[in-house]
């Protein structure tokens, strides 16, 4: 199964952003809103997690760059199965090592099509950053109180779904209901 979590249309780059700091602030706000308040995106995240639980075989989920929405839903999965926040954050930040060539190519393309000044404004959001992850996580906790409540109330998963996810992802895990 393949799930596109990019949304119904490609996002336009925001207009009127004057500095890289403006872009970072805009991005933090956008990512936090997407994770905690955008019901359409939350629905797609729930579909991704349910497909991992209930569909046999290879699973592929993606977004536009494979780092923001994909990174967030992957982090949620890791947190739901019991990984520690700091370990999930470090895994998320590894994205930069694996995408450095693509990010550089994207930046160079932006320089050639929009000019260096504009490319420099957008450059910070081509990577992943701790502050991007933290903005999403903090807003989700503020709204839902915990990742488990986010999963059930925001993403539409049941407690049984979360137990089955753990069974799928963790070697030797026995669900509470199997005890």
Across the structure, where does each feature detected by a protein language model lie?
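Cys-dependent protein tyrosine phosphatase-like superfamily
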Residues: 1-60, 72-179
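Ser/Thr-glycine-rich phosphate-binding loops at phosphate-binding pockets of nucleotides
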Residues: 65, 69-70
């Amino acid at each position: 199964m393949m799930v596109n979590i990019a949304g119904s249309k490609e996002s336009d780059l925001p207009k009127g952003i004057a500095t890289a700091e403006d872009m970072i602030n805009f991005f933090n706000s956008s990512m936090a809103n997407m994770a905690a308040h955008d019901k359409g995106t939350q629905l797609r995240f729930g579909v991704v997690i349910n497909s991992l639980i209930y569909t046999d075989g290879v699973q592929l989920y993606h977004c536009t760059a494979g780092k923001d929405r994909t990174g967030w839903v992957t982090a949620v999965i890791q947190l739901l199965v019991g990984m520690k926040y700091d370990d999930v954050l470090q895994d998320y930040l590894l994205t930069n090592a694996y995408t450095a060539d693509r990010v550089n190519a994207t930046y160079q393309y932006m320089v050639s099509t929009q000019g260096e000044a504009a490319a420099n404004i957008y450059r910070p959001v081509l990577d992943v950053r701790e502050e991007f992850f933290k903005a999403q996580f903090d807003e989700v906790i503020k709204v839902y109180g915990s990742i488990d409540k986010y999963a059930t109330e925001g993403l539409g998963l049941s407690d049984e779904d979360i137990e089955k996810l753990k069974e799928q992802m963790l070697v030797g895990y026995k669900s509470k209901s199997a005890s």
